[in-house]
Design a protein with these regions (language model features):
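Catalytic nucleophile-loop/oxyanion-hole region of alpha/beta-hydrolase
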Residues: 84-110
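Conserved alpha/beta-hydrolase
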Residues: 66-88
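Acidic catalytic loop of the alpha/beta-hydrolase fold
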Residues: 213-217, 245
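N-terminal cap/lid segment of alpha/beta-hydrolase-fold proteins
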Residues: 13-41
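Short alpha-helix in the alpha/beta-hydrolase fold that links the catalytic acid
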Residues: 62, 218-227, 251
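Catalytic histidine-centered segment of alpha/beta-hydrolase-like enzymes
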Residues: 242-254
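The serine-hydrolase catalytic nucleophile loop
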Residues: 54-66, 220
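Short beta-strand/loop motif that positions the catalytic acidic residue
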Residues: 201-202, 208-210, 214
């Protein structure tokens, strides 16, 4: 059984330099809001970035994509899920359903053109869910080390699992930081599982980029996605020396090329 070793630092690679966009809020009522940045141009295609678990819109991939789109006149949106970054909500109170709802709110309220969605790690799961529910709007998908169903394979010890069953949560310590994994996160994840299906009814073109040295999500995950999706236009790009970060210049270049090709 492959275990996901999600770490806070694995998804919080900072983008060196100043902020490249003005942060705004999408107000959703009941004091809920999503923080986002968006290019001011209009274009035939809108690019949206779905980040990873405990990541935010200041991460390397999000900012690199945003800057690329800004300089090339492409409408682009990056944002923080509920309980992440500057958005409202407490991380440990949120679930896959909440983060999927964040994606839907952004897509429906902040974009109108056909979409190219870039999903990193957990964002790769959310981009597939969004493509299933908003298929007519999605022009293409780019998965960066996509991690569908990761809640089924979290690397927790027996004592952590016992604590979670007893108290509803456990603390995961990784890379000099700690965060809470809740039972409701795992239970809710079961509602959105994809890899247990015979076919995933996503029909749009997609590019999946995965590092062969990824010790968080095995690259075979992207191969499995490619087999299961209904789309006949799927490319899998394996980066032999790539880790889960995929934040090196080569991997970032592959991401931008994939976005360009899908536009």
């Amino acid at each position: 059984v492959k275990h996901y070793r999600f770490s806070y630092n694995a998804h919080r690679q900072s983008c060196v330099g100043a902020v490249v966009g003005e942060e705004k809020r999408l107000e959703l009522g009941n004091s809920s809001y999503i923080s986002y940045m968006q290019t001011t141009v209009q274009s035939p295609v809108s690019v949206v970035f779905f980040g990873g678990f405990m990541s935010d819109m200041r991460g390397t991939k999000a900012q690199h994509l945003f800057e690329y789109c800004k300089s090339h006149g492409v409408h682009c949106t990056v944002f923080d899920y509920f309980g992440h970054g500057s958005s409202s909500g407490e991380f440990q109170e949120c679930t896959i359903s909440d983060w999927y709802a964040s994606c839907v709110s952004v897509v429906e309220s902040l974009t109108s053109a056909p979409l190219v969605i870039v999903g990193s790690s957990m964002g790769g799961w959310l981009m597939l869910l969004t493509a299933l529910s908003h298929g007519r709007r999605v022009r293409g998908l780019v998965g960066m080390a996509p991690a569908p169903d990761f809640t089924e394979s979290l690397d927790l010890s027996e004592s952590q699992r016992a604590e979670m069953m007893r108290t509803g949560k456990t603390v995961k310590n990784t890379d000099n930081c700690s965060y809470v994994i809740t039972k409701k996160l795992i239970d809710d994840g079961k509602v959105h599982l994809l890899m247990n299906k015979r076919e995933i009814a996503v029909e749009c073109p997609m590019v999946l980029i995965h590092g062969m040295d990824d010790d968080v999500v095995p690259y075979q995950t992207s191969l499995a996605i490619a087999k299961k999706v209904k789309s006949r236009d799927v490319r899998v790009h394996l980066v032999k020396s790539g880790t889960h970060h995929l934040a090196d210049e080569h991997s970032l270049g592959l991401m931008l090329k994939a976005v360009h090709d899908l536009m």
